Amino acid sequence: MVNLILVGPMGAGKSTIGRLLAKELHLAFKDSDKEIEQRCGANIPWIFDVEGEVGFREREQAMLTELCAADGMVIATGGGAVMRDGNRQVLRAGGRVVYLHASVEHQIARTARDRNRPLLQKPNPGQILRDLMALRDPLYREIADVVVETDERPPRLVVQEILERLRKLPPR
């Protein structure tokens, strides 16, 4: 089976929905950020502190290339994975891409107390999320086969909508 690749902003529910999708479809689930942390033996904030965002993005690109080369997985990506052209090409070629859209207001609510998000550990995280969304939303849409709204929706309903929408797509 082709991979299902979840893209979207932080706080959209990629990991939660990805696990549920994988269970429903009897597929393996991989979270690219968690895979990077396991390989490095360090968390994302530490990698950002030591290697900077560029160093982290290099690791991310290598991980996405590896994960997308396999088949039959649900893959949750980091929110910034779409920023590199090479990543977008890998993701697009690596399977069906589902953009989990969340409004900035919901992103703020879902990430407010999460200290594991280096890009938000600055003054005015709400403005940071607005700026990131303005930059990334067109890139998520560029590679998405399906766009699904996650605001005010239980994860199981989002999973059902994803499955219904994917069934309606022509085969690749």
Swiss-Prot record:
Its cofactor is Mg(2+). Its EC number is 2.7.1.71. Signal peptide: none annotated. It comes from the Bacteria. One of its GO terms (cellular component) is cytosol. Substrate binds at D33, R57, G79, R136. Coiled coil: none annotated. It is found in: Cytoplasm. InterPro entries: P-loop_NTPase, Shikimate/glucono_kinase, Shikimate_kinase/TSH1, Shikimate_kinase_CS. It catalyses: shikimate + ATP = 3-phosphoshikimate + ADP + H(+). Binds 1 Mg(2+) ion per subunit. One of its GO terms (biological process) is chorismate biosynthetic process. Belongs to the shikimate kinase family. This is Shikimate kinase. It comes from Pseudomonas aeruginosa (strain ATCC 15692 / DSM 22644 / CIP 104116 / JCM 14847 / LMG 12228 / 1C / PRS 101 / PAO1).
